[in-house]
């Protein structure tokens, strides 16, 4: 009896690869592990993908397309920044794959839809052509990507995660506003407002509720650690 093709198989394989990446990075992503996690056989995976890097390339391409689709629904540059952060934090494993060396991160010499979308929005707001704003967009992207990776990889803990997300959006909008008011003039850069440094942004649209749960867990763990330290200090006394 002929076997019926599974139209969802390739997506299951990519989802499995993403989960495995989240557990242990590239070293945990073997063809056999992908097959087991996807609920299929290793030969079946090889029928669709040559090797691990081929799977990662496919996952990377899909993630780029999904990020672009998410950004196209935004009405303003500020919303684009917010959505970029939200996407990176909601799809953290896929986002890490997108910029990992194994999968070769995008460069200015290959199509990068999301980067080009930002440049087009900058051209609409500031004038000129998208290419004119490549340098500015590199600075803005560095801000967004750096913030996302610091949060994803746990370099920022507790309430600092939320403050960093707000500060990133504030900084993004401040830089764009400074470029808008000074276009055609030479300037030394935007002057940073006090609320940016203090992390008092009011961007209520930013969906960072999923970070608050981890913040509470971190506070609980810090409290336990503090209690242990205090008990040890008391005992030594």
Name what the model sees in each region:
Residues 30, 96-99, 107, 153, ...:
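Short, hydrophobic secondary-structure boundary micro-motifs
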Residues 78-100, 104-112, 141:
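Helical hydrophobic small-molecule/effector-binding pocket
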Residues 120-124, 153-237:
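C-terminal peripheral helix-coil segments that are non-catalytic and often amphipathic
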Residues 103-139, 162-174:
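Amphipathic alpha-helical packing segments from all-alpha helical-bundle domains
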Residues 9-17, 34, 59-63, 67:
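Generic hydrophobic, amphipathic alpha-helix propensity
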Residues 6, 56, 60, 64, ...:
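Amphipathic, non-transmembrane alpha-helical scaffold segments
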Residues 12, 16-54:
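Helix-turn-helix
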Residues 61-80, 109-113, 118-124:
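Amphipathic alpha-helical linker/stalk segments
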């Amino acid at each position: 009896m002929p076997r019926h093709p599974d139209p969802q198989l390739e997506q299951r394989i990519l989802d499995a690869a993403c989960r495995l990446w989240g557990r242990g990075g590239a070293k945990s992503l073997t063809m056999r592990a992908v097959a087991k996690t996807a609920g299929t056989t290793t030969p079946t995976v090889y029928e669709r993908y040559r090797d691990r890097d081929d799977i990662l390339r496919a996952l990377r391409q899909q993630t780029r397309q999904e990020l672009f689709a998410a950004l196209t629904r935004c009405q303003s540059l500020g919303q684009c920044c917010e959505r970029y952060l939200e996407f990176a934090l909601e799809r953290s494993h896929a986002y890490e794959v997108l910029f990992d060396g194994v999968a070769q991160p995008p460069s200015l010499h290959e199509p990068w839809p999301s980067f080009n979308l930002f440049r087009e929005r900058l051209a609409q707001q500031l004038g000129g052509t998208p290419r004119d704003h490549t340098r500015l967009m590199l600075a803005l992207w560095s801000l967004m990507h750096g913030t996302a990776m610091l949060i994803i990889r746990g370099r920022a803990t507790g309430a600092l995660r939320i403050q960093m997300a707000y500060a990133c959006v504030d900084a993004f909008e401040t830089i764009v506003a400074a470029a808008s008011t000074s276009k055609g003039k030479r300037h030394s850069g935007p002057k940073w407002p006090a609320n940016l440094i203090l992390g008092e942004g009011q961007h209520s649209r930013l969906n960072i509720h999923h970070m608050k749960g981890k913040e509470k867990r971190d506070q609980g763990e810090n409290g336990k650690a503090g209690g242990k330290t205090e008990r040890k200090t008391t005992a030594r006394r």
